[in-house]
Amino acid sequence: MTAKKTIDIVEKALEESKKLDRKFKENVDLVFNLKNIDMNLPKNRIDQEVILPHGRGKEAKVAIFASGELAIKSKKHVDLLIKPEEIEELSSNKKKFKKIADEHEFFIAEAPLMPTIGKSLGTVLGPRGKMPKPVPPNADVSGMVNNLRKTVKVRSKSTITFHTIAGSADMPKEQIAENIDTIVKRIEGILERGRLNIGSVYVKTTMGPSQRLI
């Protein structure tokens, strides 16, 4: 059950957002500040993917590297299909591929193509945290893509302050609040000391002021 406090904080953030006439659809962001933890140690860094129960508001874009039957089967479910013969072309046109990498949140790939992708395009995908997930044999590509469209990445790198998306400002406050509670619970669960490693958590719209949750 979603905490009433979370719903109240989301409501405040949305009310503040409405005071300002935005010309675009704002996201609702969740900002974490950790404490008593050494982020120079790789084991302490956050690198999680969380499926939001009510989605992101605006779905994440997904691209697939595939050939043959998988390419045919998956084309209608993804935003971009990259065939094996295109990998070499993209590796020699990094500017073009960087644009693709920035426009797509997730990449999946036919398993046999993974080594080629890593060798040819890994320098672009790796630093962005977007190396493809292999598609298992006989996988339900539609289900896999649908889950990714509702997924957010939570990455701290080496800093104690980091943020992620919890939804969009036009979603019902109860849905945003449940998304937030799902993310916070995940982060608490992987921190060595749980809630004791969290200094504060703020909720805000893209351009709006922060409202403290924790």
List the predicted regions and their residue ranges:
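Intrinsically disordered, compositionally biased charged tails
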Residues: 1-8, 212-214
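Flexible glycine-/small-residue-rich
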Residues: 66, 166-168, 205-207
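Residue-level signature of catalytic and energy-coupling elements of molecular machines
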Residues: 74, 126, 203
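Translation machinery proteins
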Residues: 18-72, 89, 93-94
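Flexible, glycine/charged-enriched surface loops at secondary-structure junctions
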Residues: 23-28, 190-202
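Long, charge-patterned amphipathic alpha-helical coiled-coil/hairpin "stalk" segments used as oligomerization
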Residues: 84-177, 181, 185
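C-terminal edge-of-domain segments
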Residues: 202-214
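Charge-dense, extended regions
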Residues: 10-14
